[in-house]
Amino acid sequence: MTNIRKSHPLIKIVNESFIDLPAPSNISAWWNFGSLLGVCLILQILTGLFLAMHYTSDTATAFSSVTHICRDVNHGWMIRYMHANGASMFFICLFMHVGRGMYYGSYTFMETWNIGILLLFTVMATAFMGYVLPWGQMSFWGATVITNLLSAIPYIGTNLVEWIWGGFSVDKATLTRFFAFHFILPFIICALAAVHLLFLHETGSNNPSGISSDSDKIPFHPYYTIKDILGLLIMLMMLMTLVLFSPDLLGDPDNYTPANPLNTPPHIKPEWYFLFAYAILRSIPNKLGGVLALVLSIMILAIVPLLHTSNQRGMMFRPLSQCLFWLLVADLLILTWIGGQPVEYPFIAIGQLASILYFLIILIFMPISGTIENQLLKW
């Protein structure tokens, strides 16, 4: 009799994806983030489900319902902060995962990469709408500012914004629909993640050397299951340290003030994981130009595979490209810092320089360095 693991129609799929999957023998800890993202997603769906049981998506009661969760619901404070800080962990893992893909040339798996970009956009949309739900000052004004960006679209912009708002300002209708979307999107993310894995398993994983590992594969279980569990424990330890010791470290104090359309906060800024894109948006004085730069700052990932000029897949043996990659990382950190600063000298100039450098590195410097390295190998 054959093993049920290999014969049962449903269990067979799980077996071929997580147990008997042939994996490269040399993938490093940078390959842990895929599974960590899966865990983050499950954690967010579960904590979100329990929060939704007590939350009311009405402008009159949303803020007090979140307060009620924190004060009166059993372990409500912990569920709320696990959800809020879980989003931060989600984005840390996302950035690491995308960075790994760029460093090791995983973007040559075009379908997997493009589904990944779609996932990134969907997660960003979900996080943005989730930030609006507590209905604090920064929730309200963040929603107003970001949705207002769509009014920069010629001809249909204003109508589009009012259609999304469900009125002439961010109000009850906006909050209700944002809650509905925030609830449904994680399940769409689940479906996209399954497609992402499907495409990945068509080709098999990349590895640090960038060379085909078909001749040297090991089973996913037990080798990488145990390795993933280590990564998971480290991540959960970091998350729970944040939740139990300084849950508001990454939040904005303004969000503890109920939303007031008559009083604008001095500095409107999104959560930390959007600050790099926000800095790029603000660095362009023109509204439409800023919106285009904002979208392009993420969409640029879609053309990264087309800009690959090197004969080698990854950057493991390409010191020049490595320098540029880490320059890009430093540049993104500077943009993140600038996004949280007021719009005044010298922050405006720093933000503009960092934004220009961001696009220059990806569009011009990296393809040139690939070509130079090809020439150096010939000599």
From Swiss-Prot:
It is a multi-pass membrane protein. Its cofactor is heme b. The chain crosses the membrane at residues 33-53, 77-98, 113-133, 178-198, 226-246, 288-308, 320-340, 347-367. It is found in: Mitochondrion inner membrane. Disulfide bonds: none annotated. A ubiquinone binds at residue 201. GO terms for cellular component: mitochondrial inner membrane; respiratory chain complex III. SUPFAM superfamilies: a domain/subunit of cytochrome bc1 complex (Ubiquinol-cytochrome c reductase) (SSF81648), Transmembrane di-heme cytochromes (SSF81342). InterPro entries: Cyt_b/b6_C, Cyt_b/b6_C_sf, Cyt_b/b6_N, Cytb/b6-like_sf, Cytochrome_b, Cytochrome_b_C_euk/bac, Cytochrome_b_N_euk/bac, Di-haem_cyt_TM. Keywords: Electron transport, Heme, Iron, Membrane, Metal-binding, Mitochondrion, Mitochondrion inner membrane, Respiratory chain, Transmembrane, Transmembrane helix, Transport, Ubiquinone. Pfam families: Cytochrom_B_C (PF00032), Cytochrome_B (PF00033). Heme b b566 binds at residues 97, 196. Binds 2 heme b groups non-covalently. PROSITE patterns: CYTB_CTER, CYTB_NTER. Heme b b562 binds at residues 83, 182. It comes from the Eukaryota. CDD domains: cytochrome_b_C (cd00290), Cytochrome_b_N (cd00284). GO terms for biological process: mitochondrial electron transport, ubiquinol to cytochrome c. The keyword Hydrolase does not apply. The cytochrome bc1 complex contains 11 subunits: 3 respiratory subunits (MT-CYB, CYC1 and UQCRFS1), 2 core proteins (UQCRC1 and UQCRC2) and 6 low-molecular weight proteins (UQCRH/QCR6, UQCRB/QCR7, UQCRQ/QCR8, UQCR10/QCR9, UQCR11/QCR10 and a cleavage product of UQCRFS1). This cytochrome bc1 complex then forms a dimer. Component of the ubiquinol-cytochrome c reductase complex (complex III or cytochrome b-c1 complex) that is part of the mitochondrial respiratory chain. The b-c1 complex mediates electron transfer from ubiquinol to cytochrome c. Contributes to the generation of a proton gradient across the mitochondrial membrane that is then used for ATP synthesis. Belongs to the cytochrome b family. Heme 1 (or BL or b562) is low-potential and absorbs at about 562 nm, and heme 2 (or BH or b566) is high-potential and absorbs at about 566 nm. This is Cytochrome b.
